[in-house]
Amino acid sequence: MSSSASYWAGKARQFRAHVTARVGVDERARLIEWLSPPQLALFDSMHVADRRHGLDVVATLRADGVTDDEILLAGLLHDAGKGHTGVWPRVAYSLGQAFGPWVWRIASYIPGWRDALRRLMDHAETSAVLAGEAGCPARTVELIRHQDAPIDPVAGRALQLADEAN
């Protein structure tokens, strides 16, 4: 029961974080020193909740001692492929992960949700492609592509743990 309660508490925290997400002007300004113009444009194109999440993942990675810019860049941009998917399709997607694909089948009847759910399902690959197009290093692209099932046992797992923590 406690694992179920902690799961739902985590989902409630994610929901609250999504609807209250903000990125400060100073946070955005610091990225100018770190990102190339195409990478910054990709960051700016992301939903504000995904930008906030990316910044939080980077902060967690740094707190864990990660200094490798390729890993940090993957943490920042790993959800770029989610686009501007709203909160309710994201809730349906999470419910589908927890209870099975029948949730997605039902939710896909809601106008616009089929595409939104597909974006969420495919976001790792889409994010990797977008990162590559923005000039990210090949290693960053691969870390993003394999974010859910890391093939790099150190960097990939660090990214996955930081993502899950946020």
Each model region followed by its residue ranges:
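Non-catalytic interface/linker regions that flank or bridge core catalytic/transmembrane domains
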Residues: 1-42, 148-151, 166
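Divalent metal-dependent catalytic cores for phosphoryl transfer on phosphate-bearing substrates
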Residues: 32, 37-166
